């Protein structure tokens, strides 16, 4: 059988950049890695809480973290940054305070920047969150996938593949279903492929959502 490699890791240094920029001594690497993961989890939980009741749902496309000795720069790429900014910027201040309490590093300042994604539904992470929300509300998966592809086709992408695995529509036997529109050349390293895996917690169990988005070739 063919072995499936992560499309993002496969293209790092060619068309894909790292989402984390920091350096650590070998003995401290695991500690830095754990802190990086905690910061990402903290941001995702906070954002989900903030936009849970928002009509302008955009979700997070990606989080980029750059760590220095005295500064931690965090860039959050989201579909609708306005839903995260409260009056006088209190939303960002609250998030910064949460991260400071989590890391407990008084010598390191935290700088958070929100960046707007012009085409939210061209981002696999935002699409996956949208699909997961529909599946958790017991919408039929074929209808959900069809709607997601319609949203994606309104952007400038050249191809998309969506795969859902698990007890689809509550069936006793788990299975894998996938749909592809356009080209998705996974073997071409110079192809700009965005990829996301996202779990959906349904009453029948966990459904695994995988999305590949093809934008362009170098």
Swiss-Prot record:
Pfam families cross-referenced by the UniProt entry = Ribosomal_S3_C (PF00189)
The terms describing its cellular component in GO are: chloroplast; cytosolic small ribosomal subunit
Q: Where on the tree of life does the source sit, at the highest rank?
A: Eukaryota
Tell me the ranges covered by the KH type-2 domain, including all copies: 47-118
BP GO terms, sorted: translation
Keyword field: Chloroplast, Plastid, Ribonucleoprotein, Ribosomal protein, RNA-binding, rRNA-binding
One Gene Ontology MF term:
structural constituent of ribosome
For this chain, the family text in UniProt reads: Belongs to the universal ribosomal protein uS3 family.
Q: Which NCBIfam families match?
A: rpsC_bact (TIGR01009)
Q: What name has this protein been given in UniProt?
A: Small ribosomal subunit protein uS3c
Organism of provenance: Angiopteris evecta (Mule's foot fern)
Question: What gene makes this protein?
Answer: rps3
